[in-house]
Every structure is written in structure tokens, then in C-alpha cells.
């Protein structure tokens, strides 16, 4: 349903039918076609006098003509599709008009063909838009077209037949009629019962048909009202677009949310109306229930008078398994609720709304059938009461005839049983409708509450924007709070990002190292300043006063709201982009901090191990000495030779020794104090930093950093070479303009009687010729340099692929969990993969730019060579040039000649091109050519560049 509404809202059909003048699409196409035809005729009328013109016409003008033919064919196909669409619509409209107004239609005289077949022999389809005819019009049927052989009247045919022929015809008609009757095999009484049953069924279906017809007419009127409103609004839109020259359209997310909200509100209104009608039907059913109870009591009274009381068969009415139905409905609702609790996407939301619309439509049909069933129950109950009243009136006459009385009581009992079954069916249908109403209302509420949580399928940024879309309603407060909600969400996102970053730092830090705490806090304050600035900027922004901005008109309000909402979305995207940049900088800073923290942790852990080992040695030497003298001598020996042992330059370690058997020995030791504390300073350990073994992660990081450095240098050289293309193009354009001026002057001088005009023009054209030759040399050097850049780019891509394969291999060995230094964690591997993918994408972009630059330079070189060849023909210097270049061509096997001076030192473009070239010295060639420097800087083995 939503897809159908969207296709109707954004169709070219509006542009071609609503406007009074021709559509802009058709005007644009016609104007474009006229311009192309004029240009193509101009191309065709040109004459190819010279070989160069013929080559230009074949290689450049011929593809243009081919493109024009293709575009003309596409335009013709588009017009043909529109014509096909219009012709089908017109044919169906003609059929509808012929059906509604046959007196205005001229019937063609056809041959003896079947009236139900078209001209091609296929059966004629009924008119499509018969339901579009307004109600209240008595539509006559289309009269049959008379055959050629049946133009004679009936009286003329009867007059030519005799009485024998008439009798024969009558008897044959009766025989055919009797043979056509199908035998059912029922008796007369059974046939009467079957006829009565079928007639009642027909009556019930006709009643239901009337209800469906009334609901259809109401829906039909509402449909055309909406169609007229849409047409008027579209006319206004088109007029405004024509007036202001605008072509703006609604954003897809806004249109999607508006359509979904409108569909849900329509479903909610329809359900409310159906529930009101259902309440009326329930009240009528309760009234009929009381009447059925009264009829049952009257029937029991009659039966007890004439017969003995038997087991009450009427109470054994067949009932449906209500418990099973309740269980099925509850399970279906639970499954729908579980599905709705999942994250909704746009496609799922559209599917759920379509299901809801189909459910509401089926509820309308079921409610109409329930109302018709209640009316049928009322008529059946009326008939039952009439039969009971008749039986009560005739009971005096039927007392004598017991058989007839018993038959009538049996018939009345069957009728009462049927009425009770019908009432039970009404009750079951009512319960089913109530359950369906509950499920539909819950579904509407769930979908209305989850429109804000809908996520896009492909675009993550679109998901965040779509979550902010409110449910469209008539209240202005929800619209007024739209911008404040978006700004609060932006602030929350900034704060959440900052808190998550603080949490990551807190997990990486250890409470044993105070210096690392200070370092991380300093870094967090440094990296969090930009996010805080963003928050303060958002806080400083003042929200506009929407009450003053909104005018009185509803359309103007919608426009203002749409503009403000668009600005809010734009600000949101800008803030999100800034947050992404801040996060990227923070990640880079955190990576460096993580490396430093890891080094500090390793150093501290190593020193802790050494301290513990030295403590154990001290404890064992103090406790395990067998004799005091040996212990004292040993202690004195150790103190004499190793007075201090230090692990780090600032670490002091004190040991308190208070055993009772060492007090005297300590007193006898010279140079000792009487204190029981002995401060030992360890200084035997080497203070030089340990050589750190690089891990696989460090190796990969080093390779990636090396590639990044090479990328910087490569980008510098690549940008320089790309900028040279513009310089070459400008120079060639200037030279071409000067040549055109010289040609104009030469034509003017040829018209004058002077004879020295050719020599003057030739002397002025020779510097331009030499300059063009130098540019051709420079272009050849640029092409060779670009080949070197291309090879280097392929080698860089191959190195990136090798690094990526190494990361994948190490990650596959570890299984995503880092166990040792020879493995990489899954998170770090993902970061490396992301960096490599970014570099690959940069390489692809560079490759594309390089290919486009090569094409431009080749085209420029071809143009320069064409100008040079023409100048050589005009100046008559081709022979000298060929004589001078013959040995070089034979030695270089057809390759273009590059002067040695230009190859070694490069060519410097001249500023004043019209002046004669001065004698060059060797000092002007000191600066080396950038092309040669780029050519010899890198030589990598080429890899395979991706397509």
C-alpha cells in the first residue's frame, strides 16, 4: 500500500495531466531534440576537403552522430511507452463510456463475428473502470448488434411458416427444455426443504451484499474526495513551481514517516468506527438472545403439554473449541509482539503496515458480514415466533390429531435448533472480531510508538536521522519540540562518546602507576577539548521562538516546519562529522598512549620480579645460616664488596633486621651504627635499558607507517605532476591563439600587394614552432614519468596486499584472542584492516586520477603534433626536419626523439613567446628537471593493480 501511494505521489503522470500547458518534461525533450537535430545537420553538411578534416569527421564527429541516434531512439521509446499507456487508458475509458451511455455511441457494422470477441478473435474483457461511474445513474446494458441475416421482423418470419411448422417447433422446444432439466434425485419434500434452505441462504447473502455495497459506496465517495483533494494540491504545487522556478521535493525519510503515520491514523480511525458499529450489533444480538430464550420457553411449554418431557437435545448445541482459538490467537499475538520488539527497518515497517491495512480491510468485511448475520438472526427469530404463535392458536384443533401435532413440534424443534446454532455462530464471530480488534489496536499502538526507532537498511547516518522523526499528529507541541529534541540528542551523543573514551582509558590504566594516571588524565583533557567545545556551541545556540515564526495558515506552518527541520538535520550531520574527526584524533592519541603504557607496564613488571627475587635472597641468607660467625663474616664480606644494589637510579630498599642473636655482632662491627635498621642500596643491576624484542603488532605497525610515509612522498610528486597538466594546457591554448592571430594577419597581408608578407609571417611563426616542439618534448617526459608513477602505485598496492595477508594469517592462528607477542588481537587486526582498506581506496582514487591525466596528456600531445605538422606544411621546413631526424629515427626504431639537453636538464617554458630565442648558456640549465627527479626516485617491482 505504501509503495503504491509513493508511486502515485512521485509520478510523471501528475506533470503531464494536471498542468494546463504542456509538461516541462515534454518541452525540455522537444527543445533538446531540436538542438541536437540542428547540430547533427550542421555536422552532416560539413565538407571534408582535407585529410585532417575527414579524419576529424570520422574519429570525433561520427561518435557524436552515433550518440545522437541512440538518444533519439531512447526518446522515441519513452514517447512510445507514454503513448501505449495513454492508449490503454483511453480504450478502457471508451468502453466505460459506451457501457454508461450507449445512445451516444455509434455501433460499427461488423460481419457475422461473435459479440463477445474483439477484432482479433480474443474474448472481450470487461471494462476496467466500471466502478468509477458515479452512483445514482441507471446504467442500461449495451444492446446487441443485429446480424445481417436477422434484420427481418418476427412477423415476417411467422407469416412464411405454416401451422405444421409451428407445432413442430413447439414440440421440439418442449423436448429440449425437458432434456435440459438436471435430475437431483431428491423427493418432493426434500426438494422443498432444499429450496427453502437455498432461498434463506440467498436472502442472507443479499443482505450481506447490501452492507458491502453501502460500505463500498461510502469508501468510493471518500476515495474520489481524496482524489480531488490530491489533484487540487498537486495543481497548487505545480503552479508554485512554475511561478518560482523551483523543483524541490520531500525528503525520502520525511515522506516515509508522513505516509506511515497517515496510514496508521487512518487505520486507527477505521478501527474506532468499526468498534462503534460492532457495539450496536452486539446490543442487537443481546436483544435477539432474549427473544430466543422466550421462544425456547414457549416451545418447552407446548412440548410438555402434548408429549412427555425428554432429554433436552436443544442444549447440546455444537460449539466451537473456544479454548483452542484463544490459544492460537494468543500465540499469534505473542509472535507478532516478538517480531515487533526486534529492530525495525524501513522494509519491515512497510510490510507490517501493509499487513495491518489488509487486516483492517478484512475486519471491515467481517464486521459487515456479522451485521448481516445479526439481521438474518432477527428474521429467523421473527419467523420462529410466528410459527410458535400459529402452533399455540391451532393447539385445540391439533389435540385430536397426534401425528400432525408431533410432526409440527419436530419441525419447530429443528427450526429452534437452527436459530440457536445461528445465534451461537453470531457469538463466535463476535468473539473473533473482538480479539481481532484487540490485536489490530495493539499493532497500531506498537507501530506508532516504533516509528521513531526505525533503522535504515543501508545508511547508518540515515538510521540516526530516522530515529528522530516524530509521529505526525495534530498537536503543535510535538512539532515545536522537534529541534530541542534533536539538540539534546546531539549533546547526549557527545557526552556518551566522551564517557566511552574515558571508560576505555580507565580499563587500560593500572592503579599502581601514578605517573600513567597523570599522563592519561592530561591526554584526556587535551583530546576532550574539542568535544566540550561542540557541547558548549550547542548550548550557546538559541532555539527560535516557534510561536512567533509560525503564521496562521496551515500550509505556511508546514513549510516553516520543514525548513527548520531541514536545518536541524543539517546541523546534526555537521556535528556528527565533527565528532567523527574528534574520535579519529583521539584514537590516534590513545594509540600512542597505549604504546607508552605498555612499555611502562613491562618495565615495572620486570623490576617487581627482580625486587621479589632479591627479597627472597635476603630472607634465605638471614634464616638459613648455621653459625653466627659464618653469618657475620658472610654479611661483612657482602657489605665490604657490595655496599649498594639498585634496580633503578631512584629506588631505595630498606630492610629491618632485629634477630636477637645478631645484636652483639652488629655492635662489634666497625663503621656500624647502633640502630637495628639496616638500609641496603642495591646497585649491582645494570641500569642500561633492556633491548626490547619487537612483537608482530609492532612489525605490522612499522610496515604500515613506512607505507604511509611513502604515500606522503608519492602524493607530493603526483600532485606536482597533475598541476603541470593545467600549465601545459594553458600554454598550448595561448600558442593556438597566437597562431590564429598570425593566420589572420597573413590573410590580410596576402590581400595587400606587398611581397614580403610570407617571410615576415614565417619569421614570427618559427619561435612558436620551436616552443611547440619543446612542449611536445615535455609531454613525452611527463608520460614517461607517469609510467614510473603507475609502476610505483602497483608496487605499493602489492605491499599493502602482503601486509593484509600477514595480518589475516596471524589472526587466524590466534583465533581473535591475543595469547602471546607473536599474535594479534581481533580488535587490533580490525584496526589494521581498516587502515589498509583506506590506503587501498586512496590508491584506487590515485590510479583513476592518473589514468585521466594520461588521457588528457595524450590528447594534448596529439593536438600539439597536429599543429606542428600543419606548421611544417605551412612554413616549408618539413624537409629540413626530416633530413635532420633521419639518422636518429633509424637508430631509435621509430620512437620520438628527445634531445639530450632536455633529457638531462629539462625544458624551461618561455614567457615571451613572440620574441626570438636568445642564445642559451649552460648556467640556465643548472636546475634539474622535476620530471627526471620523479622518474629516477622510485623503482619498485610492479604488482597487479585492482580493476
UniProtKB/Swiss-Prot annotation:
<dbReference type="Pfam" id="PF07765">
    <property type="entry name" value="KIP1"/>
</dbReference>
<feature type="domain" description="NAB">
    <location>
        <begin position="10"/>
        <end position="90"/>
    </location>
</feature>
<dbReference type="Pfam" id="PF25014">
    <property type="entry name" value="NET2A"/>
</dbReference>
<feature type="compositionally biased region" description="Basic and acidic residues">
    <location>
        <begin position="618"/>
        <end position="627"/>
    </location>
</feature>
<dbReference type="InterPro" id="IPR056888">
    <property type="entry name" value="NET2A-D/KIP1-like_dom"/>
</dbReference>
<feature type="region of interest" description="Disordered">
    <location>
        <begin position="911"/>
        <end position="947"/>
    </location>
</feature>
<feature type="compositionally biased region" description="Acidic residues">
    <location>
        <begin position="109"/>
        <end position="118"/>
    </location>
</feature>
<feature type="region of interest" description="Disordered">
    <location>
        <begin position="105"/>
        <end position="131"/>
    </location>
</feature>
<keyword id="KW-1003">Cell membrane</keyword>
<comment type="function">
    <text>Plant-specific actin binding protein. Associates with F-actin at the plasma membrane in growing pollen tubes. May be part of a membrane-cytoskeletal adapter complex.</text>
</comment>
<dbReference type="Pfam" id="PF24918">
    <property type="entry name" value="NET2A_C"/>
</dbReference>
<feature type="coiled-coil region">
    <location>
        <begin position="568"/>
        <end position="619"/>
    </location>
</feature>
<feature type="coiled-coil region">
    <location>
        <begin position="722"/>
        <end position="809"/>
    </location>
</feature>
<feature type="region of interest" description="Disordered">
    <location>
        <begin position="743"/>
        <end position="763"/>
    </location>
</feature>
<feature type="coiled-coil region">
    <location>
        <begin position="348"/>
        <end position="454"/>
    </location>
</feature>
<dbReference type="InterPro" id="IPR011684">
    <property type="entry name" value="NAB"/>
</dbReference>
<keyword id="KW-0472">Membrane</keyword>
<comment type="similarity">
    <text>Belongs to the NET family.</text>
</comment>
<feature type="compositionally biased region" description="Basic and acidic residues">
    <location>
        <begin position="635"/>
        <end position="644"/>
    </location>
</feature>
<feature type="compositionally biased region" description="Polar residues">
    <location>
        <begin position="645"/>
        <end position="660"/>
    </location>
</feature>
<feature type="compositionally biased region" description="Polar residues">
    <location>
        <begin position="915"/>
        <end position="927"/>
    </location>
</feature>
<dbReference type="GO" id="GO:0005886">
    <property type="term" value="C:plasma membrane"/>
</dbReference>
<keyword id="KW-0175">Coiled coil</keyword>
<dbReference type="InterPro" id="IPR056889">
    <property type="entry name" value="NET2A-D/KIP1-like_C"/>
</dbReference>
<feature type="compositionally biased region" description="Polar residues">
    <location>
        <begin position="749"/>
        <end position="761"/>
    </location>
</feature>
<feature type="region of interest" description="Disordered">
    <location>
        <begin position="618"/>
        <end position="675"/>
    </location>
</feature>
<dbReference type="GO" id="GO:0051015">
    <property type="term" value="F:actin filament binding"/>
</dbReference>
<feature type="compositionally biased region" description="Basic and acidic residues">
    <location>
        <begin position="662"/>
        <end position="675"/>
    </location>
</feature>
<protein>
    <recommendedName>
        <fullName>Protein NETWORKED 2A</fullName>
    </recommendedName>
</protein>
Amino acid at each position: 500500500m505504501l509503495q503504491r501511494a509513493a508511486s502515485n505521489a512521485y509520478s510523471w503522470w501528475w506533470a503531464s495531466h494536471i498542468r494546463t500547458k504542456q509538461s516541462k518534461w515534454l518541452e525540455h525533450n522537444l527543445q533538446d531534440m531540436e538542438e541536437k537535430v540542428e547540430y547533427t545537420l550542421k555536422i552532416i553538411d560539413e565538407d571534408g576537403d582535407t585529410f585532417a578534416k575527414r579524419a576529424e569527421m570520422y574519429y570525433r564527429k561520427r561518435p557524436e552522430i552515433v550518440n545522437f541516434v541512440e538518444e533519439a531512439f531512447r526518446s522515441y521509446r519513452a514517447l512510445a511507452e507514454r503513448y501505449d499507456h495513454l492508449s490503454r487508458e483511453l480504450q478502457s475509458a471508451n468502453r466505460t463510456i459506451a457501457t454508461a451511455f450507449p445512445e451516444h455511441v455509434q455501433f460499427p457494422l461488423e460481419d457475422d463475428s461473435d459479440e463477445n470477441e474483439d477484432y482479433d478473435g480474443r474474448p472481450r474483457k470487461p471494462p476496467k473502470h466500471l466502478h468509477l461511474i458515479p452512483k445514482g445513474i441507471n446504467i442500461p446494458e449495451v444492446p446487441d448488434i443485429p446480424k445481417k441475416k436477422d434484420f427481418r421482423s418476427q412477423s415476417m418470419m411467422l407469416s412464411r411458416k405454416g401451422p405444421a411448422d409451428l407445432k413442430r417447433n413447439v414440440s421440439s422446444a418442449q423436448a429440449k427444455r425437458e432434456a435440459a432439466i438436471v435430475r437431483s434425485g431428491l423427493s418432493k419434500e426434500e426438494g422443498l426443504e432444499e429450496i427453502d434452505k437455498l432461498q434463506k441462504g440467498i436472502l442472507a447473502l443479499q443482505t450481506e451484499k447490501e452492507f458491502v455495497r453501502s460500505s463500498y459506496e461510502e469508501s468510493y465517495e471518500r476515495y474520489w474526495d481524496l482524489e480531488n483533494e490530491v489533484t487540487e494540491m498537486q495543481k497548487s504545487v505545480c503552479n508554485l513551481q512554475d511561478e518560482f522556478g523551483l523543483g524541490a521535493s520531500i525528503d525520502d525519510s520525511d515522506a516515509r514517516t508522513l505516509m506511515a503515520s497517515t496510514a496508521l491514523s487512518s487505520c486507527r480511525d477505521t478501527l474506532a468506527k468499526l468498534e462503534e458499529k460492532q457495539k450496536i450489533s452486539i446490543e442487537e444480538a443481546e436483544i435477539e438472545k432474549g427473544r430466543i430464550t422466550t421462544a425456547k420457553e414457549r416451545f418447552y411449554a407446548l412440548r410438555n403439554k402434548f408429549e412427555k418431557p425428554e432429554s433436552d437435545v436443544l442444549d447440546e448445541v455444537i460449539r466451537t473449541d473456544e479454548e483452542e482459538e484463544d490459544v492460537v490467537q494468543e500465540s499469534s499475538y505473542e509472535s507478532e509482539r516478538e517480531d515487533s520488539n526486534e529492530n525495525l527497518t524501513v522494509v519491515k515497517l512497510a510490510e507490517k503496515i501493509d499487513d495491518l491495512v489488509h487486516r483492517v480491510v478484512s475486519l471491515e468485511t467481517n464486521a459487515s458480514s456479522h451485521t448481516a448475520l445479526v439481521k438474518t438472526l432477527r428474521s429467523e427469530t421473527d419467523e420462529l415466533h410466528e410459527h410458535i404463535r400459529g402452533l399455540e392458536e391451532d393447539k385445540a384443533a391439533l389435540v385430536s390429531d397426534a401425528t400432525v401435532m408431533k410432526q409440527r413440534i419436530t419441525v419447530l424443534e429443528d427450526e429452534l435448533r437452527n436459530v440457536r446454532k445461528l445465534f451461537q455462530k453470531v457469538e463466535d464471530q463476535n468473539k473473533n472480531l473482538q480479539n481481532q480488534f484487540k490485536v489490530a489496536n495493539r499493532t497500531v499502538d506498537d507501530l506508532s510508538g516504533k516509528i521513531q526507532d526505525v533503522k535504515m537498511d543501508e545508511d547508518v547516518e540515515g538510521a540516526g536521522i530516522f530515529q528522530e522523526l516524530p509521529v505526525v499528529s495534530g498537536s503543535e507541541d510535538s512539532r515545536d519540540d522537534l529541534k530541542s529534541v534533536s539538540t539534546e540528542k546531539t549533546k547526549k551523543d557527545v557526552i556518551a562518546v566522551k564517557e566511552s573514551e574515558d571508560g576505555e582509558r580507565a580499563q587500560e590504566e593500572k592503579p599502581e602507576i601514578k605517573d600513567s594516571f597523570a599522563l592519561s588524565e592530561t591526554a584526556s583533557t587535551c583530546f576532550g577539548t574539542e568535544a566540550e567545545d561542540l557541547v558548549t556551541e550547542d548550548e550557546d545556540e538559541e532555539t527560535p521562538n516557534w510561536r512567533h515564526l509560525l503564521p496562521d495558515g496551515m500550509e505556511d506552518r508546514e513549510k516553516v516546519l520543514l525548513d527548520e527541520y531541514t536545518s536541524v538535520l543539517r546541523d546534526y550531520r555537521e556535528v556528527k562529522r565533527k565528532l567523527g574527526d574528534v574520535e579519529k584524533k583521539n584514537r590516534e592519541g590513545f594509540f600512542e598512549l597505549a604504546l607508552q603504557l605498555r612499555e611502562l607496564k613491562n618495565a615495572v613488571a620486570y623490576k617487581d620480579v627482580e625486587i621479589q627475587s632479591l627479597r627472597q635472597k635476603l630472607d634465605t641468607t638471614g634464616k638459613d645460616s648455621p653459625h653466627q660467625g659464618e653469618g657475620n663474616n658472610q654479611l661483612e664480606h657482602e657489605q665490604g664488596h657490595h655496599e649498594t644494589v639498585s634496580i633503578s637510579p631512584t629506588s631505595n630498599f630498606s630492610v629491618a633486621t632485629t634477630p636477637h642473636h645478631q645484636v652483639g655482632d652488629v655492635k662489634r662491627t666497625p663503621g656500624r651504627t647502633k640502630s637495628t635498621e639496616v638500609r641496603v642500596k642495591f646497585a649491582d643491576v645494570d641500569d642500561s635499558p633492556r633491548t626490547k624484542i619487537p612483537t608482530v603488532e609492532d612489525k605490522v605497525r612499522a610496515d604500515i607507517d613506512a607505507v604511509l610515509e611513502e604515500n606522503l612522498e608519492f602524493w607530493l610528486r603526483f600532485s606536482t605532476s597533475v598541476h603541470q597538466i593545467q600549465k601545459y594546457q594553458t600554454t598550448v591554448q595561448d600558442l593556438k591563439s597566437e597562431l590564429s592571430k598570425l593566420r589572420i594577419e597573413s590573410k590580410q597581408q596576402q590581400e595587400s600587394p606587398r611581397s614580403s608578407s610570407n617571410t615576415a609571417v614565417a619569421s614570427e611563426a618559427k619561435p612558436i614552432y620551436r616552443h611547440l616542439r619543446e612542449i611536445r618534448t615535455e609531454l613525452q617526459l611527463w608520460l614517461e614519468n607517469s609510467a614510473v608513477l603507475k609502476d610505483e602505485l602497483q608496487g605499493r598496492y602489492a605491499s599493502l596486499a602482503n601486509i593484509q595477508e600477514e595480518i589475516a594469517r596471524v589472526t587466524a592462528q590466534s583465533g581473535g584472542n591475543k595469547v602471546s607477542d607473536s599474535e594479534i588481537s581481533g580488535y587490533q587486526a580490525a584496526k589494521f584492516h581498516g587502515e589498509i582498506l583506506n590506503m587501498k581506496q586512496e590508491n584506487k582514487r590515485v590510479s583513476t586520477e592518473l589514468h585521466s591525466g594520461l588521457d588528457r596528456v595524450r590528447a594534448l600531445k596529439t593536438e600539439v603534433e597536429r599543429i606542428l605538422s600543419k606548421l611544417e606544411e605551412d612554413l616549408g621546413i618539413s624537409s629540413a626536419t626530416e633530413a635532420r631526424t633521419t639518422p636518429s629515427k633509424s637508430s631509435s626504431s621509430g620512437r620520438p626523439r628527445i634531445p639530450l639537453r632536455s633529457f638531462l636538464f629539462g625544458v624551461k617554458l618561455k614567457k615571451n613567446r613572440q620574441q626570438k630565442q636568445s642564445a642559451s648558456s649552460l648556467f640556465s640549465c643548472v636546475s634539474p628537471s622535476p620530471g627526471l627527479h620523479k622518474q629516477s626516485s622510485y623503482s619498485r617491482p610492479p604488482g597487479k593493480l585492482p580493476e
